[in-house]
Design a protein with these regions (language model features):
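Expand to "…catalyze enediolate/carbanion chemistry for C-C bond making/breaking, isomerization
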Residues: 14
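Bacterial N-terminal signal peptides that target proteins for export
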Residues: 1-10, 20
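Core of compact, soluble alpha-helical bundle domains
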Residues: 23-150
Length: 150
């Protein structure tokens, strides 16, 4: 029941953030002040992403999407991305989300499972709930580039 509530809440938040970003004509919102620090700066984000990719590989819902992935390279790219989104000094140098996910046949439920794994990882790392929500709001607009199958 709790997982269903969280998934629905998350889907609503993702939808609202995506609609808000489209209404403002922007790809992503500016990073809220203090978010980079709340995630432990680059070191904290790197530790979070190292744990996150291991959990993605271990979760039966998300594991098939990461069978052929280089987990250390994935963690590095995600670290760059979250560091940049959170207002840190990093620059994301990877491919676009659309290009990376275009041929993976990702459905909304797959995306929601990944977000649940991310939330569990952030909880395990002690990231405050408010900081988690601010980061998820920054990531939400990527949904339209990641979900490629109805």
């Amino acid at each position: 029941m709790k997982e269903t509530f969280i998934a629905r809440l998350l889907a609503t938040a993702i939808t609202l953030a995506a609609v808000n970003a489209q209404a403002q004509g922007t790809a992503a919102a500016a990073a809220p002040a203090g978010l980079y620090a709340a995630f432990g700066e680059r070191t904290g984000i790197a530790a979070l992403m190292d744990d996150f990719v291991l959990r993605l590989k271990a979760d039966k819902r998300t594991a098939p999407f990461f069978e052929k992935s280089n987990l250390s390279e994935l963690a590095r790219g995600l670290t760059e991305q979250l560091c940049m989104l959170s207002g840190g000094p990093c620059k994301y140098t990877g491919a676009s989300m659309k290009k990376v996910h275009d041929d993976l046949d990702i459905r909304r439920r797959d995306f929601n499972a990944l977000v649940e794994v991310l939330q569990d990882t952030m909880d395990a790392k002690g990231i405050p709930f408010s900081a988690q929500n601010r980061m998820l709001a920054l990531l939400a607009p990527m949904h339209r580039d990641v979900v490629t199958k109805p």
